[in-house]
């Protein structure tokens, strides 16, 4: 299994970044490739087990399930259930940490 790690520093306080990230249906507001998104079955977007269904700018669709969410650790983990892009057995974990030299956030 391949493993990819990405990280960046966001010029915003961790509380504000986490508020957006913990909403599993918010990525159409900040991810440039996502056009529209909705949570299936009317579940809350921070409910572990909820499924988001979204469309990309190129017309592809992806369904992902939230499998873990920790406010104390500021960690979110999700997996792809179905996709029209060639991704299989995809699991992602995002963790936020405060940057100590300012009001910024480390996304890992």
Regions found by a protein language model. Give the residues of each.
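Hydrophobic ligand-binding cavity/cleft-lining segments
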Residues: 1-44
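Glycine-rich portal/gate segments that line the openings of hydrophobic small-molecule binding cavities
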Residues: 26-29, 38-86
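A generic beta-sheet turn/junction motif
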Residues: 10, 57, 100-102
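A short, structured loop/turn motif at beta-sheet edges
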Residues: 14-15, 68-73, 96-106
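Beta-strand/loop substructures that line and gate deep hydrophobic ligand-binding cavities in soluble
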Residues: 79-108
């Amino acid at each position: 299994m391949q493993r990819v790690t990405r990280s960046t520093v966001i010029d915003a306080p961790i509380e504000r970044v986490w508020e957006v990230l913990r909403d599993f249906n918010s990525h159409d507001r900040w991810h440039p490739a996502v056009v529209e998104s909705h949570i299936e079955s009317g579940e809350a977007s921070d409910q572990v087990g909820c499924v988001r269904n979204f469309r990309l700018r190129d017309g592809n669709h992806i369904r992902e399930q939230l499998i873990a969410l920790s406010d104390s650790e500021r960690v979110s983990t999700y997996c792809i259930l179905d996709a029209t892009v060639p991704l299989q057995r995809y699991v992602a974990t995002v963790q936020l940490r405060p940057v100590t030299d300012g009001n910024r956030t480390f996304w890992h």
